[in-house]
Regions:
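Conserved short submotifs of the Hanks-type protein kinase catalytic core
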Residues: 86-99
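Conserved N-lobe beta3->alphaC-helix segment of eukaryotic protein kinase catalytic domains
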Residues: 40, 45-71
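Activation segment signature within eukaryotic-like protein kinase domains
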Residues: 118-119
Length: 324
């Protein structure tokens, strides 16, 4: 839209609210208000020295390039990026409902119909990304936000990657890593379908299928592939999860020749009108409580790191981000 800010002067620092939530160790997200149009945005502010120290340069560039390319109702929108000699800035749409993670923890677990609603929207988002040769690689409840109506928005595209061939880096959250990622066999679209299986299990059971006190223990359980289902889960729910959590990725649902259609045609989704899903026509099971457009009560607020203590970086380091 034409009213979007061209420079940070349009988002004066005094209009920044306290950070909404941390984005790892090198970034914070602020709620900002565009004065003239009174629109709220999320401004992600990342410390360049920290990004470099943690070797996250590629992830930051990936996030920008992927978000600039996509446009889908279930993916968070990026409007503008910029940088100065200390920080990188990404101005994104503000999604006020908070993380799916919070709702799941508050309820303990979701009913099958609630889990199914979120799964349908996530399937559409994954299918859209995969059609563009993008692997998301970080599907988990913390990265799924709810908009004001209760529909999903995937956020945090730092691990997302445009596929040229199978990729080889180990990234993601231990409980959600696919076997081929742990075994360094290279991984493509199949990792997102594995993560969907983990997510559906966690939504309807209240805990992930593979967990342990340390990552190595989790990895062993993932590779063994044994799933203990709670007794109350019905056959079709268990069947879908089993077919998504197949260790051999060539036999994993979603990763065979019919791609996402195999997932969409599974009996668990038999009542779903797939054309209606991306049009946001399905009725959300949870509608976030909001008092106003700029309400941040669905997020935990974090104390402000003192941005002023971040030193400017050298010209050489700044060169890495010249196109940001």
């Amino acid at each position: 839209p034409p009213w979007l800010p061209i420079g940070l002067q349009h988002v004066p620092k005094k209009t920044w609210r306290p950070p909404i939530f941390g984005t790892g160790t090198f970034g914070r997200v602020h709620l900002v208000k565009e004065k003239a149009a009174k629109n709220y945005f999320a401004l992600k502010v990342m410390s360049i020295p920290e990004v470099i120290r943690l070797k996250q340069e590629q992830h930051v560039h990936n996030e920008k390039s992927v978000l600039m390319e996509v446009n889908h109702p279930f993916l968070v929108k990026l409007f503008w990026t910029s940088h100065d000699d200390r920080f990188l800035y990404m101005l994104m749409e503000y999604v006020p409902g908070g993380e799916l993670f919070s709702y799941l923890r508050n309820r303990g677990r979701f009913s099958c119909s609630t889990g199914l609603f979120y799964a349908t929207e996530i399937v559409c988002a994954i299918e859209y990304l995969h059609c563009r040769d993008i692997v998301y690689r970080d599907l988990k409840p913390e990265n799924i936000l709810l908009d004001r109506d209760g529909h999903i928005k995937l956020t945090d595209f730092g691990f997302a990657k445009k596929l040229v061939d199978r990729t080889w880096t180990l990234c993601g959250t231990p409980e959600y890593l696919a076997p081929e990622v742990i075994q360094s066999k290279g991984h493509g679209r199949a990792v997102d379908w594995w993560a969907l299986g983990i997510l559906i299990f966690e939504m309807v059971a209240g805990f992930p299928p593979f967990f342990d006190d340390n990552p190595f223990g989790i990895y062993q359980k993932i590779l063994a592939g044994r799933i203990d289902f709670p007794r109350y889960l019905d056959f079709s729910t268990k069947d879908l999860i089993k077919k998504l959590l197949v260790v051999d990725r060539t036999k994993r649902l979603g990763n065979m020749k019919n791609g996402a259609n195999d997932v969409k045609q599974h009996r668990w989704f038999r009542a779903v009108d797939w054309d209606a899903v991306p049009q946001r026509k399905l009725k959300p099971p949870i509608v976030p409580k909001l008092c106003s457009d700029g309400d941040t009560s669905n997020f935990e607020t974090y104390s402000e790191n003192d941005c002023e203590t971040t030193s400017p970086v050298s010209e050489k380091d700044l060169e890495i981000f010249k196109n940001f």
